From Swiss-Prot:
Family annotation (InterPro entries): Kunitz_inhibitor_STI-like_sf (IPR011065), Prot_inh_Kunz-lg (IPR002160)
Family to which the UniProt record says this protein belongs: Belongs to the protease inhibitor I3 (leguminous Kunitz-type inhibitor) family.
UniProt cross-references to PANTHER family, sorted A to Z: CYSTEINE PROTEASE INHIBITOR 1, KUNITZ TRYPSIN INHIBITOR 2
Subcellular location: Vacuole
Function according to Swiss-Prot or TrEMBL: Probable inhibitor of cysteine proteases. May protect the plant by inhibiting proteases of invading organisms.
Pfam families in the cross-refs: Kunitz_legume
Protein name: Cysteine protease inhibitor 10
Gene3D superfamilies: 2.80.10.50
């Protein structure tokens, strides 16, 4: 088991303007690869509340600007108001919602390994982390990958998969398999 070293301050995560990501600020999470797009929330199963975490693509039915997210710290003592590399955060869609669906905006991973909403801030299994990548993508800087890091289990990369006709975010078992992300201030 590794413990956080109190004296170790991890590097900040940066958006496309070169500014550190701030807790509680709104961002669009975007896959910068050609043909890919921003992450968004949608209802694809006739559910009471939308809960699918999808990725826009450069094809007509999947075009779009994305749904803003906010990052929430795991605990108040976590490194001030900036998001840092490999530090536990909760990811929450910033959307207008009904009273009924107000608790359906925090990301989690379901039994099918799909990223969905319905997570809870405070639930150790709904934690995500951000890791820097070495990818060089033209016109982009600060390219990262997202990891799902449930309590007592190994972190898994977030990748994408077409499931039931939709580009879904999923966890993947292969360390080399992931989709890159950049963060754009919303």
């Amino acid at each position: 088991t590794c413990h956080d070293d109190d004296n170790l301050v991890l590097p900040e995560v940066y958006d496309q303007d070169g500014n550190p990501l701030r807790i509680g600020e709104r961002y669009i999470i975007k896959n910068p690869l050609l043909g890919a797009g921003a992450v968004y929330l949608d209802n694809i199963g006739n559910l009471q509340c939308p809960n699918a975490v999808l990725q826009h693509m450069s094809i007509p039915q999947f075009l779009g600007k994305g749904t803003p997210v906010v990052f929430i710290r795991k605990s108040e003592s976590d490194y001030g108001d900036v998001v840092r590399l490999m530090t536990a955060v909760y990811i929450k869609f910033f959307v207008k919602t009904t009273k009924l669906c107000v608790d359906e905006t925090v990301w989690k991973v379901n039994n099918e390994q799909l990223v969905v909403t319905g997570g809870n801030v405070g639930n150790e299994n709904d934690i995500f982390k951000i890791k820097k990548t070495d990818l060089v993508i033209r016109g982009m800087k600060n390219v990262y990958k997202l990891l799902h890091c449930p309590s007592h289990l190994e972190c898994k990369n977030i990748g994408s998969n077409f499931k039931n006709g939709y580009p879904r975010l999923v966890t993947v078992n292969d360390e080399k398999d992931f989709i890159p992300f950049v963060f754009i201030k919303a």
